[in-house]
Amino acid sequence: MRRTVLAPLALAAVLLGVRPAVAAPASAGPGNGTHVEAGTGTGWDPAPSAPFDFGAGLRCDFPVHGEPVVDRVVQHVLDTDPDGSVKRVLYKGDLVIRVTNTETGAFYDADASGSALVEYRTDGSQSWAAHGPVLVGVGEGKGNLPRGLYVVDGVYTMSIGADGYKAVNLVRGTTDDLCARIG
């Protein structure tokens, strides 16, 4: 499962709508703050993913719960802005998220152990260069993928607008619709 390619990942939290904190738990529910605190800058720091919940109709037609069952993601801060907020971060490490349909109990263990280089912009937008599987949540009308939860795998870039719009651009890869898997 370990990938050591491009630049690394802790992606699930950010892709589901959260911006991770460096050297501190990503206060992880979707929609939490967008400020990233800089860590020591002397190596790789843990970047844990928190559980998440989406009501029916927000990602899938049914309510969904996600929880890490394997989380060995680390991050390395490359650059900070003059105010100390993080500008560019590498993420990598093993991450498996159990995604559960809370109406039926059906679940799927999604491998999100990809790697990424993420640039956080001052307007709240982000730019991703990624390799390997990452869990991506898309709201209605908020991306170039339909509303849903996906494992995006391969080589790709992703832009996340300040408004949360996610544009996934596959160079080579696949998308796996998790709502269909557990629906």
Give short role names for the model-derived ranges.
Residues M1-P25:
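Secretory targeting and sorting signals
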Residues A26-G183:
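Beta-strand-enriched cores of mature, soluble protein domains
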